[in-house]
């Protein structure tokens, strides 16, 4: 726990009651930066609105969040800023910083300063020494650049992160298919089956990394082999989804040669297209349309309310494939990283 004095309280002068000289003047509270005490402080933590607020209570129950990963900056009983990390069940350390908010009614210098101090304090107390902080993720509207308020909210948080050493890594499209949207009928060009085993899936994932346009994969390939990247992706993410692996599909030509694969899944929040790829030697033939339709079809049979997916804003071929399949661009995601 850390308590510091607010660097500038001019913003609160208008809120101070005027008193006679003979009256006792109560001392102004200092800015307190601390972890939340537990679920009983969720109402405090949620005073600054964000799209993930409705998931916080269940995340705490499921172990995807912990009180020691959730931080607030308060002045008296007023919440001025907050930050929280998310982690996979059973992990000792978080994997993403996905909540960072400030009171947007504060003057710009104050809200930036308070956000920076909160984040630096929380990072020092929460994250392991000597390792880069986990990636930052912010879910934002698709037209966030077009509105003065929405742009300021996003850019303020980016400034806070930049002052702690983070840099913009990638902007991603958030996509959604909704029941009732037509799914293309099978073209007959490909057949589909579940993968035989983990080694087959790992081998296909390794091959698919050749020529990838995905920013995260390309960055990982600068630090490790394609086989290691595929193995880590499989073990750290894909294998942990609670949905059955029987949903996964390998796409094949009539002679049984694999051309790609799709991993329909449920991540505990939504049905998703977790991974889709066409092998390098088969790209350029729009096999991705057949593969994406099959993945969507698998999930649609589960009577789900929606299917979510995402791809890098710069991955134009994949974005067009989702558009052809009836997925709408309903949001964006900003990822920032520390090096």
Language model: regions and residue ranges:
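Hydrophobic adenine-recognition pocket in adenosine-nucleotide-binding enzymes
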Residues: 276-278, 311
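Conserved acetyl-CoA-binding loop-helix of GNAT-fold acetyltransferases
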Residues: 108-127, 278, 284-301, 319-324
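Conserved donor-binding loop and adjoining core beta-sheet/short helix segment
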Residues: 59-143, 254, 262-271, 279
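Active-site rim helix/loop that mediates acceptor-substrate recognition in acyltransferases
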Residues: 46-76, 84, 219-253
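Short amphipathic alpha-helix that is part of the acyltransferase structural core
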Residues: 6-58, 186-228
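Acyl-donor-binding surface of acyltransferase catalytic domains
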Residues: 1-24, 111-196, 336
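A structural microfeature
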Residues: 81, 170-171, 260, 331
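Conserved active-site tyrosine of GNAT-family acetyltransferases
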Residues: 157, 161, 322-323, 327
């Amino acid at each position: 726990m850390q308590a510091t004095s607010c660097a500038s309280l001019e913003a609160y002068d208008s809120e101070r009651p005027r008193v006679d000289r003979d009256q006792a003047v109560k001392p102004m509270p200092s800015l307190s930066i601390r972890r939340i005490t537990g679920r009983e402080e969720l109402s405090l933590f949620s005073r600054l609105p964000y799209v993930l607020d409705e998931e916080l209570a269940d995340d705490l129950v499921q172990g995807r969040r912990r009180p020691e990963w959730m931080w607030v900056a308060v002045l008296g009983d007023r919440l001025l800023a907050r930050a929280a990390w998310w982690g996979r069940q059973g992990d000792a350390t978080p994997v993403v910083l996905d909540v960072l908010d400030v009171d947007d009614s504060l003057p710009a210098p104050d809200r930036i300063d308070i956000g920076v101090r909160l984040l630096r304090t929380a990072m020092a107390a929460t994250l392991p020494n000597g390792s880069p902080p986990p990636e930052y993720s912010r879910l934002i509207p698709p037209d966030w650049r077009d509105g003065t308020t929405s742009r300021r909210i996003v850019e303020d948080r980016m400034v806070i992160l930049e002052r702690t050493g983070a840099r913009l890594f990638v902007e991603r499209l958030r996509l959604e298919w909704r029941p009732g949207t037509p799914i293309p009928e099978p073209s007959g060009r490909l057949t589909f089956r579940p993968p035989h085993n983990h080694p087959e899936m790992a081998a296909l994932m390794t091959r698919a990394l050749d020529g990838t346009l995905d920013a995260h994969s390309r960055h990982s390939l600068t630090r490790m082999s394609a086989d290691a990247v595929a193995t880590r992706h499989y073990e750290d993410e894909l294998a942990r989804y609670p949905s059955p692996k029987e949903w996964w599909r390998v796409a094949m030509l009539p002679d049984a040669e694999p051309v790609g694969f799709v991993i329909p899944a449920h991540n505990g929040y939504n049905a998703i297209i977790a991974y889709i790829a066409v092998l390098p030697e088969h790209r350029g033939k729009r096999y991705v349309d057949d593969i994406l339709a099959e993945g969507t079809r698998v999930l649609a049979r589960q009577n789900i309310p929606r299917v979510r997916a995402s791809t890098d804003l710069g991955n134009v071929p994949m974005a067009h494939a989702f558009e052809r399949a009836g997925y709408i661009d309903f949001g964006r995601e900003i990822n920032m990283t520390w090096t």
